[in-house]
């Protein structure tokens, strides 16, 4: 292949990498996959908090691999796929132990009065709500299913295709010094 064409392809892939890395990162800020909003959380553990962002590990894990003529975006976190695609998780004994641990952790953080009653301040009320959530989860039957809604942050969409098409058109126009338009079928 002509070296100029190889350089142009490399430049196109580099431009796509930069643009799509930014766009996929912005999905976490938008709390949507481009224009497709993510389902709100039901869990009271972080009310009003960002969806899919707790420590930011999932957001930072999005990477890409580039070859001579392709680019692939991916994440290697084990829980990324269930969030991106949605699905159901079977409750296990180990999960129930974890839920009980979180319940006791939340109840142990209650602010208490001298007589031992929980305070009625905002933080204690928030923790009581959180504790109830963890108790509800811990009391689920082993083998029952927890539904995880689909919250895509990576993938192909009309917005991705449009951005890629524009990048290709810009680079070809620059290379040939001629207006170029890729029509979608």
Question: Model-derived features: where do they sit?
Answer:
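Short, Lys/Arg-rich flexible segments
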Residues: 1-185
